[in-house]
């Protein structure tokens, strides 16, 4: 079957596309947004942030995440906690068939009632899967697994294996 390319007037080039792949920049932008939804929270925004984040997950992970996040969300609201997550390193590896292994090293600054409590280095790992477009979803990448841990623990596990 021949492929057809339609160029708009004045367009001199096209972006190659193939099944089960997207540009690296697309995956990187989605990861940045996902990390922001997970880590940049306040007492007033956590419900919306976590809802958006959960909408990008597989049904199984979504149920687990919302269940496990319930107590944390209550604590954030009760104690007026704010967290700011800043990405320091981001590694994305295409593993084939539309899957991506993502590792993010980040710094989490925590505040309670606007008082700074400190900074923690952490590692976030995700497996993303390219999925068909779905209403209510901005990205065509579904989060199939998610782990969040202290960066030192992550680095020692990585060096050990």
Which residues does each predicted region cover?
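Structured, amphipathic secondary-structure segments that form assembly/contact surfaces
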Residues: 1-3, 9-25, 39, 44-161
